[in-house]
Amino acid sequence: MTDLDPARLVFVGGLHRSGTTPFAKVLGEHPEVSGLVNTGVREDEGQHLQPVYPKAKLHGGSGRFAYAPAAHLTESSTLISPANAQAMLDAWKPYWDLEASFLVEKSPPNIIMGRFLQEMYPGSAFISCRNRPMMMFGGDFS
């Protein structure tokens, strides 16, 4: 068990350039919501702050991480433990307003880690962003 109610957690995921960053920023502007801000890491993504699972870059980076079997963490992952769940929260808490009703963590790999995150934080919510494929064409792969 962690020191935060998992029902307060909202995870946003989606492939790079699918709109996760602007969506999470707009969501974080709601008075009852806090997103990770002023973290000093790329796009204020929680994946770069936490010490538990490998970052998307280690699995090929933008878009490519989704094809790496090792990046697909599920409810059977050996990384699941109360200590790891708390370690992830401890890494994110300094960048949230803990008085907010809902706490948003946005990282593209969340799109393939929902089952893992749900096991770590039962009752948490997930939002998946997607975009038309042609909008992404040529950006990361040219």
Explain the meaning of each model-derived region.
Residues 4-32:
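Walker A (P-loop) phosphate-binding motif
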Residues 13, 75-78, 126:
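Short, flexible active-site loop motifs that bind/organize anionic cofactors or intermediates
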Residues 10, 100-102, 125:
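Short active-site oxyanion
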Residues 29-115, 119-120:
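PAPS-dependent sulfation machinery
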Residues 19, 42, 135-136:
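Flexible, glycine-rich phosphate/dinucleotide-binding loops
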Residues 106-109, 117-141:
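Conserved phosphate-donor/acceptor-positioning beta-strand/loop module used by diverse small-molecule
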Residues 12-13, 37, 104-106, 128-130:
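Short beta-strand segments
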